[in-house]
Amino acid sequence: MNLEPSTSTLGTRTPPDAAVGVPSSKPRALPQGPSLFYGAALWRLGLLFARLLPERALKSIAAALVLLYARVFPGRRETVVQNILPAVGGHRARAEAVTAKLFRQFSGKVVDLWRFEAGLPMDDIFGEMTGWDHFLAAQKSGRGVLLVTPHLGNWEFGAPLLTRHGFKLNVITLVEPGHGLTELRQAARARCGIETLVIGRDPFAFVEIIRRLEAGATVALLIDRPPKTSAVEVELFGEKFSASIAAAELARATNCILLPVYLPRIGGKYAAHILPPVEYDRPTLRDRAARQQLTQRVVSALEPAVRAHLEQWYHFVPVWKRL
């Protein structure tokens, strides 16, 4: 689920000296939008290969292509390095090592997603689950449940995991870049009983989300790459960072339970970790500053998970205010 559709600069080779960056300086010519390769045509091709090729073969091909991509477009690779630097104390060599792992991990993540959306059996993809008691307690409360997650691991797999346990999940997404990709991915989720709530086309979409949460539904929201209209400044790894204030806005509107969650790949399977709910005093959320503080608390709750799995924190556009 790519939550930052915008004009891409990919395709213009970044000058070699732009790949030399330090945490205190702004590198030149970093790509600000999603890759031109991320579109319906490539996604359909990936779904086709997922049906035709063995998993291991497809993952080997995907890994080779992703590593080639990182070489051909050094600006994209440098973007990831810059995103990782604050989490490793500004150590360039460590950030580059994490970045190399991240590109390899991303290729496997995408193949897993293609296989899922192609309708292939994925029963053996899930591993450890922690914090399930937090989710069950939230369900018993009768309030809506908002699952808040970063772009970490394979966040899309939270929906089929809950479906396996008899729970329905509504997934919030922005319109995907290009023509037809939103509908393609929406249809794939629908075949698995997962409903997609697309923000950006229908001005009443946010009202529909509020209505569902008020009715006790479970909704998933990505917090760490918001559109400008819902971005608020918080701190992550000691840096200024834009996070989505939408979770706090929905808490104010519906009194929903906020559950931070993340799904990293560990030992060949995806673990699901549900953290304790982030508590709040609803009347105070009338103040925007209080909503910003609540957003900060949600981000802070997820920060240790991101730090522990940096090689699976998938951001290919700049995430820091200084960039």
What are these regions (language model features)?
Residues W114, L120, D124-G127, D133, ...:
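Flexible, active-site-adjacent loop/turn segments at secondary-structure boundaries
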Residues Q105, S141-R201, A215, P226-V232, ...:
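Catalytic core of membrane glycerolipid acyltransferases/transacylases, capturing the structured
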Residues Q82, P160, A187, E249, ...:
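Surface-exposed charge patches
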Residues L3, L10-T149, T182-Q186, G193, ...:
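Membrane-anchoring hydrophobic helices of lipid-metabolizing enzymes
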Residues F135-L136, A159, R185-Q186, I209-I210, ...:
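Short amphipathic alpha-helical segments and helix-helix/interface helices
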Residues I125-E128, L152, G178, I199-P203, ...:
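A conditional alpha-helix N-cap/helix-loop micro-motif detector
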Residues N2-E4, D17, P34, L53, ...:
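Non-catalytic C-terminal accessory region of glycerolipid acyltransferases
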